[in-house]
Amino acid sequence: MSHETGRLIVEMVRAGRRPSDIMTRNSFLNAIIAVAAVGGSTNSVVHLLAIAGRLGVDLALADFDQAGRDVPLMVNLQPSGEFLMDDLYRAGGVLAALSQVKDLFHREAITVTGRPFVEYLLDRPVYDDAVILPRESPVMANAGIAVLSGNLAPNGAIIKPAAATTALLQHVGPAVVFDSIEDMRARLDDPDLVVTVNSVLVLRGCGPRGYPGMPEVGNMPLPRKLLEQGVRDMVRISDARMSGTAYGTVILHVAPEAAAGGPLAFVRTGDIICLDLKGRSLSFDVSDEELQRRETSAKSQAAYAAPTRGWAKLYVDHVMQADTGADLDFLVGASGDEVMRESH
């Protein structure tokens, strides 16, 4: 593989085939479709947005909802199904799974070889249709990562329906708010914590600036006393990320994050939160006037304690929000083909 990779790189240079020829808008849309078809990670959202930003490719959070909404989930893998990654490999692999939805991809998008991506989806046998399902009977008909918005997430938030509990995708419940990971760990299992199965767990201070670095803690654990009652999922909201192997009705990447002054910073325990997947809405029952009062009050209190020196300061001063890829703002935009000065 190393030899073949080196050979291909030389061939690309000789042919003048550049990354910008390969990573076009349609290629990014194909990536979104592929993620939906295999139940891929929510992390793909920030990764693809950041890469597109560095190439100067027009890609927005809304594209994930639009491109992935009608894509069926073709693989019966955990956390959305039964099997494991090794089972997918033995059943034919990712390309066999994507071949089931090959008609959905943009045909003009090419790969590093210069050939259209869809050519690699032809003649891909499936060896186990319990793992890679037929097109007519997918695990889920609409598996794409959903983009939510509302007064709790003006610039958007995301949820992975394929990993969620269907009954919780339309939900109204009171917030139980944690200001940080440390606050959550200190209070979550307190027997006196006022929380029920209908509560919505809210974790803030875990976004790109707030942590800093946007850790994978969005799929926060459930309170012990509810686990002992047999509860296995609850609606959870945060400005953090979560692992692609995690399960649950978890709303992530809330933008703007709390540390950037987003409405998530002003949610209080007891506020009623409404999740409406069908309507792509995430809101809390607080008037604009009350929200303004809370924001004004917060400004009069101690400000978010941002780092004051070193890489951490550079990072928080320049990191963008999750809805635009959480990249550093000075790295956005194509670099062009200028050859830099030799350093030797």
Which role does the model predict for each range below?
Residues 1-257, 262-344:
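Catalytic or ion-coupling anion/metal-binding cores of large enzyme and transporter domains
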